[in-house]
Design a protein with these regions (language model features):
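Conserved glycine-rich Rossmann-like NAD(P)H-binding loop of the short-chain dehydrogenase/reductase
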Residues: 44-58
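Catalytic loop of short-chain dehydrogenase/reductase
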Residues: 154-178, 183-184, 188-192, 206
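Canonical Rossmann dinucleotide-binding motif of NAD(H)/NADP(H)-dependent dehydrogenases/reductases
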Residues: 17-47
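The beta1-alpha1 cofactor-binding region of Rossmann-like NAD(H)/NADP(H)-dependent oxidoreductases
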Residues: 53-54, 75-87, 120
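A short, exposed helix-loop element centered on a Lys and neighboring polar residues
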Residues: 138-139, 184
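C-terminal helical subdomain
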Residues: 201, 219-277
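Conserved mid-core segment of classical short-chain dehydrogenase/reductases
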Residues: 86, 109-124, 168
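Catalytic Tyr-X3-Lys loop
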Residues: 116-135, 150, 154, 179
Length: 284
């Protein structure tokens, strides 16, 4: 699906241009929204970037209910479209002094099918959004941050980033594994070129959102089997819980090539050990 620049809407609300600014892609809902909500609570200017106009309007309303000194800027953008991302960056910099933090969060899930059952269009869209969108956004914001002599870019990992495999996640997992390599390579380049830009990875683990049972954004539903639900009930968490942890880490960070992990091996092991008497059910 092609999203032309003529459908590119901008909603700019009053605030201060002296605050730090964070851009989060795919932030009208779910994990991304929790990021902009929490940064707004901390008086950041927040840039909500998403492909869904309706979701953007709803996010805008909720964010305006939060008392903050920062601005709210919302953009309907397809992150695979270079002109749209570039135009958004230009527009943001007319409203604020700097873009201090950029979080590549936008992504879509894979239909629960084997690789040979997927149409090429589905494969292309998965790779375009989950991998190439992250690369493109990083490419476009890096020169801005280099010119500022400061900035932070974080890429959100997913299943497959740690080389895990699962039936029905072949393309999604491949894309996320590549995102990990790309992030490490970008961190190396940023360091060797002495850019003063910090690069990092956000590893949230299993989040209980519509993402886990919906493919390609608002596409077909994914039916989770009982075994998968059991694992999600043990290891999963709501996005607001994970985002709270991540935002504090990001604000405090002063290092390049970092990885912020919510579901550590120790935490996962403890969850399994205590699952017999600590019952949770996200699917009731």
């Amino acid at each position: 699906m092609l999203y032309l620049s003529c459908f590119y809407d901008i909603f700019i609300l009053e605030g201060s241009d002296s605050m730090k600014t964070v851009v989060v892609t795919g932030s009208a809902r779910g994990f991304g929204y929790e990021f902009v909500r929490l940064f707004r609570e901390r008086d950041y200017n927040v840039v909500v970037c998403d492909i869904s106009k309706d979701a953007l309007k709803e996010a805008e309303k909720k964010l305006l209910d939060i008392e903050s000194k920062g601005k709210v800027l919302t953009y309907e953008v397809d992150i695979t479209n270079e002109d749209m991302v570039s135009n958004m960056i230009t527009s943001v910099l007319k409203e604020v002094k700097t873009i201090d933090i950029w979080i590549n969060n936008a992504g879509v899930n894979q239909p629960d099918k084997a690789i040979w059952e997927l149409d090429k269009k589905v494969i292309d869209r998965l790779v375009d959004i989950d991998l190439k969108g992250t690369i493109l956004c990083s490419k476009l914001i890096m020169p801005v941050m280099i010119k500022q002599k400061s900035g932070q870019i974080y890429n959100v990992e997913g299943y497959g980033s740690n080389d895990a495999k699962k039936l029905g996640l072949s393309i999604y997992g491949t894309s996320k594994r590549a995102v990990t390599y790309f992030t490490e390579a970008l961190a190396l380049e940023a360091e060797e070129r002495k850019t003063n830009v910090l690069i990092g990875m956000i590893t949230p683990g299993i989040m209980i959102t519509n993402f886990i049972n919906t493919s390609l954004g608002d596409g077909e539903k994914i039916e989770l089997d009982e075994k998968t639900k059991k694992v999600y009930n043990i290891l999963g968490d709501y996005p607001e819980t994970i985002a709270e942890f991540m935002v504090d880490k990001i604000i405090a960070n002063k290092k390049n090539n970092v990885q912020f992990t919510w579901l550590t091996n120790r935490k996962a092991a403890w969850r399994f050990m205590t699952s017999g008497f600590n019952k949770r059910n996200f699917f009731e």
